[in-house]
A protein has these predicted regions:
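Bacterial N-terminal signal peptides that target proteins for export
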Residues: 1-9
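Boundary at the C-terminal end of the N-terminal hydrophobic targeting segment
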Residues: 20-23
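Bacterial N-terminal signal peptides
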Residues: 8-17
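Active-site segments of SGNH/GDSL-like serine hydrolases
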Residues: 101-105, 128-153
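Conserved SGNH/GDSL esterase-like catalytic core that processes O-acyl groups on lipids
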Residues: 25-30, 35-123
C-alpha cells in the first residue's frame, strides 16, 4: 500500500508539471542501481519498476531503464554510476523527466567512508542532467540503506 501511495504521489506531480498532450512521447529516464535495473526479479523486463511505470503511464510516455547493478553516486565508490556506458546512454537519451534512484550501494561500509562527499557528488549528478538540452524535470527517489548478510562486506 505504501508503494502505491508513493507511485500515486509521483504521478500527480508528473501530470501537474508536464503537459500530457504533447505530440511526441514524454521521455522518462529511470536512473539507478540494481533496484532500478530489476536484478533478481522474475521476468525483469516486465516487472522492474521502469517497465511497470511505462505500463501505468501509457503511450504518451516513453520510459527507459538506465539501471546498472551495484552502482554508486560516490565518485570514489567501488562502482560509480558516472563511469558506466549506461550513464552515457541516459545523457544521450535527452529525457524530459529523470528519476534518480541511487544511494543504496553508497551505504556499504567500503563506500560510506566517503560519506562527506555524497552530497556534492549527488549535486554534480543532478546538475549534469539539469544542464542537458532537454532541461528535464528531476525527481529524486529516496534510497534505501543496504543490508548485507551478517559477516559479509
Amino acid at each position: 500500500m505504501k508503494k502505491l501511495n508513493h507511485i500515486g504521489i509521483f504521478l500527480v506531480c508528473l501530470f501537474i508539471t508536464i503537459q500530457s498532450f504533447a505530440s511526441e512521447p514524454i521521455r522518462v529516464a529511470c536512473i539507478g542501481n540494481s533496484i532500478t535495473y530489476g536484478a533478481f526479479i522474475p521476468n525483469r523486463e516486465m516487472n522492474c519498476y521502469p517497465a511497470q511505470l511505462q505500463a501505468y503511464l501509457g503511450d504518451g510516455y516513453e520510459v527507459k531503464n538506465f539501471g546498472a547493478s551495484g552502482r554508486t553516486i560516490l565518485s570514489k565508490g567501488d562502482y560509480p554510476y558516472s563511469e558506466t556506458d549506461t550513464y552515457k546512454a541516459s545523457l544521450e537519451y535527452q529525457p524530459d523527466i529523470v528519476l534518480i534512484k541511487l544511494g543504496t550501494n553508497d551505504t556499504k561500509p567500503q563506500n560510506w567512508k566517503y560519506k562527506n562527499e555524497f552530497k556534492d557528488n549527488y549535486q554534480t549528478l543532478i546538475d549534469t542532467y539539469r544542464n542537458l538540452k532537454s532541461h528535464p524535470r528531476i525527481i529524486l527517489l529516496t534510497p534505501i540503506r543496504c543490508f548485507l548478510p551478517e559477516g559479509s562486506e
